[in-house]
């Protein structure tokens, strides 16, 4: 079965230089994939002319759509909504809405993508604020879903509860975790720690659990501190978008620094170069495990269609990973699973134990709707 994905080719720091090459790399990885690419036709054709010969054969599965306007990274959400007509981002989302594609991938302005996604695709019933989620590696070889990553920098209790429910469905559907362990990110595990919205969300999740002991769809384990994200103590970690984005960016920076320093250390002297040659297979495995590029692509959970956000600074390889994430979500029919699960629940149905024991106007939720200095605080 052919899988069709709409690409906003003009998003991201590198623009079509990364998105065009990354899209062709994705086509080489997925033989059933067809890409609908939106952007200024002349610019896209120029990039296609520079493709390596090994990728030129995949152009037959790439369809160009002329979309001359670009939504910049600095554009505020309200401006993007007003000026979206003719843009590559709106074109890609419209392709999903009109059935020409099954998913959209963009490296563009996150706030604009979320707001336009809500307008064009709608949201799943019962979800007022979609959230951005991605998986991060854990030391036990597994993955942990972190959300929100920047779509909602100012959240209420009910939004955090919704994020917990959506993250649990993501872990069940994508990673086949039977009963995902869900935690709230906090500055301590004590009951009195954290801001009011986090404490209230903790209370709501615990009260829900006490009413539904034995029929849980996820296991609420309470508060988790930052170091627990990578320990494997939880399958889903929930926080507001400001905190989540800061955690993700700091983690990416740390991973990049560690890999760079490790390589520099092994290259410093002849003896270590010899050791490096012998240790090369293990080093490559470590790099593959920690390289942030491999985890590129964040899901906009809660939309009624599939939209994947690529990191703005991603290169072609990273963008290809984001496209692959969209392919997987199509295969899993993720929005339908979310809609069914949340409809069946009506409200969350977690079981619970302590984390300490295991170790008009589209309201985007963004501060950029109110303060121009925060116009793009997210990925």
Swiss-Prot record:
<dbReference type="GO" id="GO:0006633">
    <property type="term" value="P:fatty acid biosynthetic process"/>
</dbReference>
<keyword id="KW-0963">Cytoplasm</keyword>
<comment type="subunit">
    <text>Homodimer. Probably interacts with PlsY.</text>
</comment>
<protein>
    <recommendedName>
        <fullName>Phosphate acyltransferase</fullName>
        <ecNumber>2.3.1.274</ecNumber>
    </recommendedName>
</protein>
<dbReference type="GO" id="GO:0043811">
    <property type="term" value="F:phosphate:acyl-[acyl carrier protein] acyltransferase activity"/>
</dbReference>
<dbReference type="GO" id="GO:0008654">
    <property type="term" value="P:phospholipid biosynthetic process"/>
</dbReference>
<feature type="compositionally biased region" description="Basic and acidic residues">
    <location>
        <begin position="370"/>
        <end position="379"/>
    </location>
</feature>
<comment type="similarity">
    <text>Belongs to the PlsX family.</text>
</comment>
<comment type="function">
    <text>Catalyzes the reversible formation of acyl-phosphate (acyl-PO(4)) from acyl-[acyl-carrier-protein] (acyl-ACP). This enzyme utilizes acyl-ACP as fatty acyl donor, but not acyl-CoA.</text>
</comment>
<dbReference type="GO" id="GO:0005737">
    <property type="term" value="C:cytoplasm"/>
</dbReference>
<keyword id="KW-0443">Lipid metabolism</keyword>
<dbReference type="InterPro" id="IPR012281">
    <property type="entry name" value="Phospholipid_synth_PlsX-like"/>
</dbReference>
<keyword id="KW-1208">Phospholipid metabolism</keyword>
<keyword id="KW-0594">Phospholipid biosynthesis</keyword>
<dbReference type="Pfam" id="PF02504">
    <property type="entry name" value="FA_synthesis"/>
</dbReference>
<keyword id="KW-0808">Transferase</keyword>
<dbReference type="InterPro" id="IPR003664">
    <property type="entry name" value="FA_synthesis"/>
</dbReference>
<comment type="pathway">
    <text>Lipid metabolism; phospholipid metabolism.</text>
</comment>
<feature type="region of interest" description="Disordered">
    <location>
        <begin position="344"/>
        <end position="379"/>
    </location>
</feature>
<keyword id="KW-0444">Lipid biosynthesis</keyword>
């Amino acid at each position: 079965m052919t899988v069709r994905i709409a690409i906003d080719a003009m998003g991201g720091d590198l623009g079509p230089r990364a998105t065009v090459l990354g899209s062709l790399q994705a086509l080489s990885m997925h033989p059933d994939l067809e890409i609908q690419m939106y952007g200024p036709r002349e610019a896209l054709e120029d990039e296609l002319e520079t493709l390596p010969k090994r990728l030129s054969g995949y152009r037959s599965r790439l369809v160009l759509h002329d979309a001359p306007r670009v939504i910049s990274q600095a554009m505020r959400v309200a401006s993007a909504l007003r000026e979206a007509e003719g843009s590559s981002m709106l074109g890609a989302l419209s392709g999903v809405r009109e059935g020409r594609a099954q998913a959209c991938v963009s490296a563009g302005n996150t706030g604009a993508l979320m707001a336009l996604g809500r307008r064009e695709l709608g949201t799943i019933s019962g979800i007022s604020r979609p959230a951005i989620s991605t998986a991060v590696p854990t030391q036990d070889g597994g993955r942990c879903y972190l959300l929100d990553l920047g779509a909602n920098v100012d959240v209420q209790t009910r939004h955090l509860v919704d994020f917990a429910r959506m993250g649990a469905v993501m872990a069940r559907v994508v990673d086949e975790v039977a009963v995902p362990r869900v935690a709230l990110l906090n500055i301590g595990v004590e009951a009195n720690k954290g801001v009011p919205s986090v404490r209230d969300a903790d209370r709501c999740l615990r009260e829900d659990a006490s009413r539904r002991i034995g029929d849980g769809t996820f296991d609420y384990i309470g508060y988790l501190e930052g170091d627990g994200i990578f320990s494997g103590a939880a399958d889903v970690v929930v926080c507001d978008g400001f905190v989540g984005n800061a955690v993700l960016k700091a983690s990416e920076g740390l991973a990049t620094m560690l890999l760079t320093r490790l390589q520099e250390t092994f290259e410093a002297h002849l003896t270590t170069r010899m050791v490096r040659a012998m240790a090369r297979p293990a080093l490559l495995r470590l790099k593959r495990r920690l390289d942030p590029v491999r985890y590129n692509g964040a899901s906009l959970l809660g939309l009624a269609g599939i939209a994947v956000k690529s990191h703005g600074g991603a290169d072609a390889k990273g963008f290809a990973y984001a496209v692959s994430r969209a392919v997987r979500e199509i295969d899993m029919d993720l929005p339908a699973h979310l809609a069914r699960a949340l409809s069946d629940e009506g409200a969350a149905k977690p079981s619970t134990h302590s984390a300490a024991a295991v170790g008009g106007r589209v309201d985007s939720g963004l501060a950029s709707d109110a303060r121009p200095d925060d116009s793009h605080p997210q990925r």
